[in-house]
Amino acid sequence: MAGISGSASSGGVYATKTQGGLTVTGLSKSFGKTRANDDISVRLIPGEVTALIGHNGAGKTTFLNQIVGLTRPDAGSIMHDGTDLITHPAQARQVCAIMPQVTSSLEGVTPRQAIATAVRIRGLKSKQAQRAVQETLDTLDLGDWADRPGHKLSGGIKRLTSFGMAVTAPAPIYLFDEPTNDVDPVRRELLWTMLRRRAEQGATVLIVTHNLLEVERHADRYLLFNKGRLVRDEPTSALGLAEAKSTLSITATPEFLQELRSVLDVKTSSSLGNMPDTEYIEKRIEDDSSIPREFTVTLSTDALELALPHVLSGIRAGCVESYRIGSASLADNYEEMINHD
């Protein structure tokens, strides 16, 4: 059952901020010729919420599975309170609570029953378990679905139930693999509230996610994986929306776009993403420079700040019909971060 990983630690308490945590050294794992994790060394600290980000296939899930003892590394160590969890996988399952990427089916059980079963397996007595389960249901605003059969639940409610199965009982270490997938925006905030609460109680919290804005808002620190390697380990204050890219969709004449590109080429060294090249723009001008065309370009924040005054001038001059700004794809933002290293 998702979210269950052995019994609770002695006494059923969270780790204190002066003990616990994880020290990973030289962790490597290959599947055939694919290097899933490549010489990863990192210290995960009690009391912190750490986000693990990176492209699909970057090695994030493999990293979690090695911590909890589901996958054995080829090399390296994972130390917790003086014990190498690689050579003591039973201890890993005892100290770690994990929410896997795959959502539990919940066939034949309600959210209340599923969470209660998980916390009892982790060592909570009946009355303790009942109180803890109710607290989770209340915090995640699951009251309306608490006693509804699993086959009648939406994907988001099932996902929150799997999260509750992992987070409710005390554990020194919590591992979550994309817990906010399929979850509505309001309950995403409630989920992060529970993660923060566990960290404040002294637990070590590691969450895999693809939502950079949530990482910046809620996590203390982020780890960036790329091709199996840890390429960044920084406080989230260093993540900065300044690094995030945006999309500028603009309906304008090709001639105006050429002028805009010239301005950005001269005044910024930032990546212009998929801004049409000069040859492409000149071909559109040859076709008919007076016909507005829609272009969508990806720009770094500083390039966007330079572009907007010219776009507004273009509107006044009749060269720009409309524009809109949106968030660039996660892939674009990851590429920007990775290319800086």
Where are these regions (language model features)?
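Helix-to-loop junction immediately C-terminal to a conserved catalytic motif
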Residues: 68
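Conserved ABC transporter NBD signature motif
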Residues: 76-87, 91-92
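Conserved ABC ATPase "signature" region
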Residues: 116, 120, 127-145
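Conserved ABC ATPase signature
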Residues: 149-153
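Catalytic Walker B motif of ABC-type/P-loop ATPase nucleotide-binding domains
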Residues: 174-178
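ABC transporter nucleotide-binding domain
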Residues: 196-298
